[in-house]
Amino acid sequence: AVCNLENSEIRDTNIVKANVILDEKNEGFAKDFVRVIKSKKNFYHHIGLYTYTPISLEKYVNLKQTFNEINRSLEQMRAIDNKMKIKVVKLKNNPPSVDTMEDLKKIRLLFKNNNS
């Protein structure tokens, strides 16, 4: 899944960007995943939400790590580099996630404020 990329996220290397051309239903296939971009065109904020068919999952786990996967620290590249298709849908909003200590602080504050 993807959502719109905010301007403040363009240079943030903790935010994975997905290169996708979406159709009129806001669906498409990922072409690439990167951490650094120069332009927002066809790039979206990647949301690490996956579903697999049993056959695809078995194929994926039996593939060796690729250079791009290791170099970029992005497991999605194993699939892309091995010509597996990753279908993408665009969501209206980015659900909260915890990938960094800063994210954890934001989530804790969110829960604290909602429980007051």
Task: Please give the residue ranges for each predicted region.
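Conserved core of the sugar-phosphate nucleotidyltransferase
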Residues: 1-66
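Conserved alpha/beta core of the MobA/IspD/sugar-nucleotide pyrophosphorylase nucleotidyltransferase superfamily
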Residues: 43-116
